[in-house]
């Protein structure tokens, strides 16, 4: 058997401390570590993966090849809450695949993510 492994989620950004404010509130995470180059957020319950916001000098260019899904029970109230925190809705309507519904959004530094409900996995 190999070593235990885990996945930490890392987002490149221009201002880790500022973007941490958005994601801390969006995910109800807590601060673990922050400096000029990096901000690490961890779940309050210790169950989900940490989110690392890593400062990079180059601006974001193009669509993310990977994104986060925020899975909730009710999409519309969550979308409104995230918009109030500084997110922007990218889809006018709700996308559907079977029982799964989602809306594409982006954080204040234009990193795409989805708000989803009905996810079976």
Regions found by a protein language model. Give the residues of each.
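Vicinal oxygen chelate
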Residues: 2-11, 17, 33, 40-42, ...
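Short hydrophobic/aromatic beta-strand micro-patches
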Residues: 10-12, 69-71
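Amphipathic alpha-helical segments
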Residues: 15-30, 82-84
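Short, solvent-exposed loop/turn segments that connect beta-strands within catalytic domains
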Residues: 45-48, 61
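Short amphipathic alpha-helices within nucleic acid-binding modules
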Residues: 76-81
